[in-house]
């Protein structure tokens, strides 16, 4: 497919994810059951594939599409396997900041992570917990942590807009944009 697209004149830069990255799931599942999430099939996170199963040694980078990596109790074993590849890696689904601990922040900030660390801030009701976890993260990282902001799902009225801007304001205050 990629070769066909290149021959048809598509720019390599638009296909680099498929050319430069080994892509797969090391874990699947999530316990949260968020209404907006497509993944409601599982009640917990579990090991899905060993890294070696989708690792292409000819590709310089690794993408992980895990649903909720931090919810998997043995996340550190998988992180060890990722690090053993020697390849820069990135989680593309976002990570669950609410599950951040000192150990997770320290480990992740001492890895060969490629790109931005991206988390989520879906509900204004979680503001105190999100602020606490951003501050925890910043104790270990000089890299900016960015957060997705969900809007327009539960409503599309002025309250939704107000909550969205309140979350953005919090993220701006903590340099997380």
Stretches with model-predicted labels:
Residues 1-63:
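Acidic, low-complexity intrinsically disordered segments
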Residues 15, 54-55, 110, 168-171:
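A general structural signal for short secondary-structure junctions and capping/turn motifs
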Residues 54-146, 151-153:
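Conserved SAM/AdoMet-binding glycine-rich loop
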Residues 32-33, 43-45, 71-73, 155-157:
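Short catalytic/ligand-binding loop motif for oxyanion handling, primarily in non-cytosolic enzymes
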Residues 153-177:
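Auxiliary Fe-S-binding modules of radical SAM enzymes
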Residues 18-19, 34-36, 74, 101, ...:
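Short acidic, gly/pro-rich beta-turn/loop elements at beta-sheet edges
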Residues 44-50, 125, 129, 156-163:
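Alpha-helix N-cap and loop-to-helix initiation/capping positions
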């Amino acid at each position: 497919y990629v070769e066909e697209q290149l021959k048809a004149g598509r720019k390599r830069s638009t296909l680099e994810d498929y050319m430069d990255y080994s892509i797969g799931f090391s874990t699947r599942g999530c316990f949260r059951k968020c209404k907006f999430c497509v993944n409601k099939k599982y009640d917990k996170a579990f090991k899905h594939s060993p890294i070696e199963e989708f690792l292409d040694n000819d590709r310089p980078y690794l993408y992980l599409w895990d649903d909720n990596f931090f919810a998997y109790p043995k996340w550190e074993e998988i992180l060890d396997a990722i690090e053993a590849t020697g390849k820069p890696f990135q989680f593309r689904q976002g990570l669950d900041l609410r599950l951040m601990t000192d150990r997770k922040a320290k480990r992740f900030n001492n890895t060969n992570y490629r790109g931005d660390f991206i988390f989520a801030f879906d509900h204004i009701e979680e503001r105190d917990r999100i602020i606490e976890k951003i501050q925890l993260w910043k104790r270990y990282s000089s890299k900016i942590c960015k957060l997705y902001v969900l809007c327009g799902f539960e409503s599309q009225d002025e309250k939704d807009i107000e909550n969205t801007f309140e979350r953005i304001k919090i993220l701006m205050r903590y340099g997380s944009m």
